[in-house]
């Protein structure tokens, strides 16, 4: 209105539409590649001008829309550029982030709560969406035409962490009904780091340690174990993993092998391995490193029983 000193016809609220890249299948949501009611994102206005917005919470509702109790309003007719991150971090005192968008305290991935590890730590980021008072929908979507794949047109949310996924099956010489998977352990990984909610950058911190993710069940069924990790490098370009199996209710067998990682864990990539538990070893096959989609198989890796 005229009272705002800008001379427009009154502020218009920004509405949000957000997609997750279609080849991303690892979120802890109902169908893995879309949002679930209650998911919340933090939205920023990244362009200069009268329209402001800093870490504004938009929450996905049961009707399939992002809504905000305090939405961003366009204060004039200028186009604005937006970014957003997930999961939303409440900052009522404006003291959790520095001016550049870095979370001041380390983000720690807690593997003691496996059911919540994926959803709580799947850091996503989107940027470059443009909207205005005349067209107030902020589209965190892919605006490429058919046949195009221009990064500057793809404003969808993308993963910034890394993921490693193990599928455990019974192999030769194993009675699946007597083999009860207990856990999978990663040796010497870092679970703390920084995230930047304005750029999507991550930075691993802290020291390396052994981390175990409990995943239990008899190998009569396929067992899947997933780790979300900070992107990180390894001194020896490899990672030691172990698989613990309770056999016949009285014997614990621990199998150990090493996974070559010449480039470490890279952000936005999924590392997938199939573990076949045998009578005296495990074999790792179907290994792939992808953009969290489908990749080519790599060679098998043998593992020895301890």
Language model features with spans:
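Contiguous ligand/interfacial binding patches
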Residues: 181-234, 238-266
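N-terminal functional modules and adjacent low-complexity/disordered segments of proteins
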Residues: 11, 15, 38, 77, ...
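Exposed, polar/acidic Ser/Thr-rich sequence context and nearby capping/turn residues
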Residues: 171-172, 232-305
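Generic secondary-structure boundary/loop-capping signal
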Residues: 154, 158, 192, 279-281
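Short, low-hydrophobicity acidic/polar segments
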Residues: 2-180, 211-227, 231, 237-242, ...
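Surface-exposed beta-strand edges and their flanking turn/coil or helix-capping segments
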Residues: 29, 97-99, 197-200, 272-273, ...
């Amino acid at each position: 209105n005229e009272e705002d000193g800008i001379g427009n016809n009154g502020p218009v609220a920004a509405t949000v539409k957000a997609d997750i890249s279609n080849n991303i299948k690892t979120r802890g949501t109902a169908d893995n590649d879309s949002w679930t009611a209650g998911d919340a994102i933090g939205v920023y206005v990244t362009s200069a001008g009268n329209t402001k917005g800093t870490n504004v919470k938009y929450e996905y509702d049961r009707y399939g829309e992002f809504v905000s109790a305090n939405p961003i309003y366009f204060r004039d007719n200028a186009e604005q550029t937006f970014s957003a991150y997930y999961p939303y971090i409440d900052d009522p005192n404006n003291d959790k982030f520095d001016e550049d968008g870095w979370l001041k305290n380390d983000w720690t991935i807690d593997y003691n709560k496996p059911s919540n590890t994926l959803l709580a730590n799947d850091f996503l980021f989107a940027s470059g969406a443009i909207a205005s008072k005349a067209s107030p929908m902020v589209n965190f979507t892919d605006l490429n035409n058919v046949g195009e794949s221009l990064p500057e047109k793809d404003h969808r949310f993308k993963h910034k962490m890394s993921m490693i996924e193990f599928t455990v099956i019974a192999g030769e010489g194993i009675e699946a009904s007597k083999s009860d998977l207990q856990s999978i352990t990663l040796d010497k990984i870092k679970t703390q780091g920084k995230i930047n909610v304005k750029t999507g950058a991550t930075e691993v911190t802290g020291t390396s340690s052994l981390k175990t993710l409990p995943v239990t069940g008899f190998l009569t069924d396929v067992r899947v174990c997933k780790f979300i990790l900070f992107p990180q490098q390894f001194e020896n370009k490899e990672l030691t993993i172990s698989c613990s199996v309770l056999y016949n209710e009285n014997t614990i067998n621990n199998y150990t092998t090493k996974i070559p990682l010449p480039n470490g864990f890279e952000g936005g990539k999924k590392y997938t391995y199939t573990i076949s538990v045998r009578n005296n070893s495990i074999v790792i096959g179907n290994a792939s490193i992808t953009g969290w989609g489908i990749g080519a198989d790599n060679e098998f890796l043998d593992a020895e029983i301890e």
